From Swiss-Prot:
One Gene Ontology term, aspect cellular component: chloroplast
Domain of life (superkingdom): Eukaryota
InterPro entries given in the database record: Domain_X, Maturase_MatK, Maturase_MatK_N
Lineage: Eukaryota, Viridiplantae, Streptophyta, Embryophyta, Tracheophyta
GO biological process, any: RNA splicing
Primary location: plastid
UniProt family annotation: Belongs to the intron maturase 2 family. MatK subfamily.
This protein's name: Maturase K
Keywords noted in UniProt: Chloroplast, mRNA processing, Plastid, RNA-binding, tRNA processing
Functional summary from the UniProt entry: Usually encoded in the trnK tRNA gene intron. Probably assists in splicing its own and other chloroplast group II introns.
Listed GO MF terms: RNA binding
Localization, UniProt: Plastid, Chloroplast
Family matches, as Pfam families: Intron_maturas2, MatK_N
Source organism: Welwitschia mirabilis (Tree tumbo)
Length: 524
């Protein structure tokens, strides 16, 4: 794939011609390895491997011809469902390669002036660390997941991203043909990871393009708007210092407009949060409803739910955020007297829910529903060192993700559950008791695999900061300071697991019977 990618990087970047990629034999082998469903049965995996190995130029050409002629149902339904899933995986991988090439050219300075970022979770954490001096209200928007398939094709044609007519025609045939899959095995096709990734990929491009046009409107209406784009920092794993901006002098009649348009906006998946003044929130409630209604060509605003949060109830990506007034007192001395004054500023204080993490650990098999540690039976086939390594890696992932929380001291409970579950797993494997295992492995495990969080965090930060910041790190108290260790791409499954459960009662989603996105709500 590397050689093929290097040879065709110029074609992908300039000519936008993706149709020949679908006739490469190794292309489907790569797609099958990337998008294979780990929960599929052994028979399904063997059938997928057989179909993947038997793919050739004539097989793909014959299958594409049947898709366009609507004759796929003539053969056995199980075989064709797997073949259609492989075609969807090939389409997804082709689009992924194309946009990855465009993103690389944009970061290197060779691309255009506008590029979409599909890994925007880095900007969310930098956004959560900002202060909101004029913001007192928040608005939550649930974007509908229903998109007509022709809007995807029209999007590519209007933006001139892909000029390959054959590729777009095949994509249109695939998406429009899904309503006719009455004889095929829909369960295998809809649950294939390649199809879900294809639909999610197209949906994310569509919504991101709508947001880019929305930001352009904000720039026209808002004077002196500072829109910070964190897309170019997508490859970094930490933010060590905020950018210092030189504020120009503001005239008296311009201060009100600056306060009025001061807002914070962030989106992850189908859920977005807007924080601003109460007047701004009321105006944007009307604006968002009509904006997404016209973008999705809805006759009515069904499927779009706008909810105004209270000041202490903002839930996003596994965190619960609340505002807290940070007061700074000043003593102003006059010629004959002095008086006290204060400066009030709103700050984000993120917290994580212990109950949500307990549910996640119970699903993973570390504890029961009540939080009591149990042995993880799926790890009994590994060696003791592998069990320690897996448990330690899982703990570090949780600590990376929640080290910026206000209540990160509660992570000691999670650490205790993982540690005791590890002991029970080893005791069950050796048919021994927990007391014997703790006497034998307790000191070694705590010394090697569970170091103190402060020392571990300090070593982690010092290894990644520049030399001039190491002295500063040795002076601050890391037990009270919040740090975002933005190694987020490796723990992306946490956001998918908890993002679905949060605010389930506040949002409603209408999915039609013949909708092309039946699995999108389960995936997000």
């Amino acid at each position: 794939m590397g050689n093929f990618y290097r040879k065709n990087i110029e074609i992908l970047g300039q000519q936008r011609f993706l149709y020949p990629l679908l006739f490469q034999d190794e292309f489907y082998a790569i797609a099958q390895n990337l998008f294979s469903n780990p929960r599929a049965s052994v028979e399904v995996r063997e059938e997928i491997c057989k179909n993947c190995n038997s793919f050739s130029f004539f097989t793909v050409k014959r299958l594409i011809f049947k898709i366009r002629k609507r004759n796929v149902f003539l053969e056995s339904k199980n075989k064709n469902s797997i073949s259609l899933a492989l075609i969807a995986e090939g389409l997804t991988l082709g689009l992924d390669v194309f946009f990855s090439a465009q993103w690389k050219r944009f970061v290197d300075g060779e691309g255009g002036t506008e590029q979409l970022s599909f890994q925007s979770i880095h900007s969310i954490f930098a956004y959560l660390d900002e202060t909101t001096p004029y913001s007192f209200s928040s608005l939550g928007i649930r974007i509908p997941s229903y998109v007509h398939p022709e809007l995807f094709i029209r999007m590519f044609n209007c933006l001139c991203w892909i000029d390959d007519v054959c590729f777009l025609h095949l994509l249109s045939s695939m998406l429009c043909f899904l309503k006719h899959l009455t004889i095929l095995d829909k369960f295998i096709f809809f649950n294939s990871k390649g199809f879900i990734r294809l639909v999610l990929f197209l949906w994310n491009i569509f919504v991101s393009k709508g947001e880019s046009s929305k930001i352009s409107l904000w720039k026209q209406k808002c004077y002196r708007a500072k829109f910070k784009s964190f897309g170019s920092f997508a490859e970094q794993t930490h933010f060590h210092r905020k950018m210092k901006l030189k504020n120009p002098k503001i005239k008296a009649h311009e201060k009100f407009s600056e306060v009025f348009f001061f807002s914070h906006y962030s989106r992850f998946g189908e859920k977005s949060v807007l924080i601003g003044t109460p007047i701004l929130i009321k105006k944007y409630r009307y604006f968002f409803c009509h904006f997404w209604q016209t973008s999705f060509f809805f006759s009515e605003t069904y499927g779009l739910f706008v909810h105004e949060f209270s000041r202490k109830n903002i839930s996003l990506i596994g965190y619960s955020f609340y505002f807290q007034n940070h007061r700074t007192f000043f003593r102003i001395k006059m010629f004959y007297d002095f008086f006290f004054t204060e400066l009030v500023n709103n700050e984000f204080h993120p917290k994580f829910g212990i109950i949500s993490i307990m549910k996640f650990l119970s699903i993973e098999g570390f504890c029961d529903i009540m939080g009591r540690p149990i042995s993880k039976l799926s790890w009994t086939c590994f060696t003791d060192d592998d069990i320690f390594d897996k448990c330690d890696r899982f703990w570090k992932i949780l600590y990376y993700y929640y080290c910026g929380a206000k209540n990160k001291a509660y992570l000691d409970r999670i650490k205790y559950i993982l540690l005791l579950s590890c002991f029970k797993t080893i005791a069950f494997k050796h048919k021994s008791t927990i007391r014997v295992v703790r006497k034998e492995f307790d000191f070694e495990l705590r010394k090697k695999f569970f170091p103190k969080e402060i020392e571990f965090e300090r070593d982690f930060l010092c290894s990644r900061f520049a030399q001039k910041f190491k002295k500063w790190l040795l002076k601050i108290n890391l037990a009270t300071e919040r740090f975002w260790l933005l190694n987020i791409l490796k723990v992306h499954f946490l956001t998918k697991s908890w993002h679905k459960d949060q605010d389930a009662l506040d949002f409603c989603l209408i999915v039609e019977k013949n909708n092309i996105l039946p699995m999108l709500n389960n995936f997000l």
